[in-house]
């Protein structure tokens, strides 16, 4: 009976303590600037912490931010060798006649995939996006289904796509939170291709001269900004997902992509092109100056070593598979301390990567964040005699 009660208490303890991923700072954080947008979000990508937000789960029209998901599927096709950058794709009548922003391709052309990607990202070309969608999915309709399937797989719970390019359509909506999930996964999953988002100017040979500059004005203002995408429709307003990476020698961890500290800002529904750039720049500046990123533990470093019952090994190391980085208000690093909360007792078998506890990061008495701790090694179940002996020890414990 005592063992049964202990096991049930352990299960309950695990359920209430270990279900969350990284949570944002609890209180007394620096006040964010006033942001003139319907919704916004600032994420410290390196620490995986939301630093500031407004209406992050409000349904909004994404406009050309839709093309982030279209690019995700194109990059996935490149990675799986279903597409090649030098491969050419035809331009259908449907792609040619797409309204809105264009790269000005026509049905007489066979356009390399690499150029279509540049047209989609730099020029925000709806024609390029449609040509890629048809090339990857076989049809736009099939591609849209792939977009929705991928959104579900990524955990984008409040997103629904109706087209590949982002033109206004009933039910074509997303949220700032879902866009942050998509943007971070786009960068981490496809580091070989996200460089397309830093291209400042592009025009496909033989097409008429137009505004060939990337609509992300921050690329021209801030050398640390290297993406990602803008969008506009009358319904959506002016929107932007921007990201910047700054090197911090004392941090020494991998950002996304490359080293240093990376922030991601999302502003939705601003008044004009300059406003979306200004509000994004304001958020990024505040995030880099009001917070600092601190590396507490290396990847695969044991935060704590815990006893294991009924296992072939008597102990298991708990830690993180990636370096543990936290974002804290500037000037509070000296006050940081950690507190480990873990399932007890730990009973084998235990799988490598299994969540078994949390580490709380405190600044004085204030909770900054808490992060899951996982088993860094697998522990197999002991033999019959070993399990029986530990069962007795647990009973009298």
Regions found by a protein language model. Give the residues of each.
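Active-site-adjacent loops and short helices of periplasmic peptidoglycan-processing enzymes
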Residues: 25-191
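Sterically constrained small-residue positions within well-ordered secondary structures
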Residues: 18, 31-33, 53, 256, ...
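Bacterial N-terminal signal peptides
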Residues: 10-21
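Low-complexity intrinsically disordered segments
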Residues: 8-11, 253
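N-terminal secretory signal peptides that target proteins for export/translocation
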Residues: 1-6
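Bacterial Sec-dependent signal peptides at the C-terminal "C-region" and cleavage site
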Residues: 20-29, 374
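Domain-terminus/edge residues, biased toward the C-terminal soluble/receptor-binding domains
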Residues: 157, 168-173, 177-397
């Amino acid at each position: 009976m005592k063992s049964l009660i202990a096991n049930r208490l352990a299960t309950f303890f695990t359920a209430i303590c270990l279900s969350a991923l990284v949570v944002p700072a609890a209180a007394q954080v620096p006040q964010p600037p006033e942001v003139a947008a319907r919704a916004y979000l600032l994420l410290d990508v390196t620490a995986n912490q939301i630093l500031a937000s407004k209406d992050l789960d409000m349904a909004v029209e994404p406009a050309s931010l839709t093309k982030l998901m279209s690019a995700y599927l194109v990059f996935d096709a490149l990675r799986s060798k279903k597409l090649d950058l030098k491969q050419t794709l035809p331009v259908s009548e449907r792609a040619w006649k797409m309204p809105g922003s264009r790269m000005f391709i026509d049905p007489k052309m066979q356009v390399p995939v690499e150029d279509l990607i540049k047209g989609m990202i730099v020029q925000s070309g709806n024609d390029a996006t449609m040509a890629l969608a048809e090339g990857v999915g076989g049809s736009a309709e099939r591609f849209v289904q792939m977009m929705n399937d991928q959104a579900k797989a990524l955990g984008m719970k409040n997103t629904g796509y109706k087209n590949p390019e982002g033109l206004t359509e009933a039910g074509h909506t997303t949220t700032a939170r879902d866009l942050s999930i998509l943007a971070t996964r786009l960068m981490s999953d496809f580091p070989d291709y996200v460089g397309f988002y830093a291209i400042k100017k592009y025009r496909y040979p033989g097409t008429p001269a137009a505004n060939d500059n990337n609509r992300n004005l921050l690329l021209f203002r801030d050398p640390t900004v290297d993406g990602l995408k803008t969008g506009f429709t009358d319904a959506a307003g002016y929107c932007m997902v921007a990201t910047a990476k700054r090197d911090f020698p004392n941090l020494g961890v991998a950002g996304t992509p490359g080293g240093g500290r990376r922030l991601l800002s999302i502003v939705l529904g601003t008044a004009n092109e300059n406003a979306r750039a200004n509000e994004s720049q304001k958020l990024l500046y505040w995030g880099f100056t009001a917070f600092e990123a601190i590396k507490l533990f290396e990847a695969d470093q044991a935060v704590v070593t815990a006893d294991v019952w009924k296992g072939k090994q008597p102990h298991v190391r708990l830690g993180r598979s990636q370096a543990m980085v936290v974002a804290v208000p500037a000037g509070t690093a000296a006050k940081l301390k950690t507190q480990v909360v873990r399932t007890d007792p730990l009973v084998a078998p235990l799988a490598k990567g299994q969540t078994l506890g949390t580490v709380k990061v405190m600044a004085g008495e204030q909770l900054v964040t808490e992060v899951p701790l996982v088993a860094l090694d697998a522990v197999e179940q002991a033999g019959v005699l070993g399990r029986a002996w530990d069962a007795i020890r647990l009973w009298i414990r």
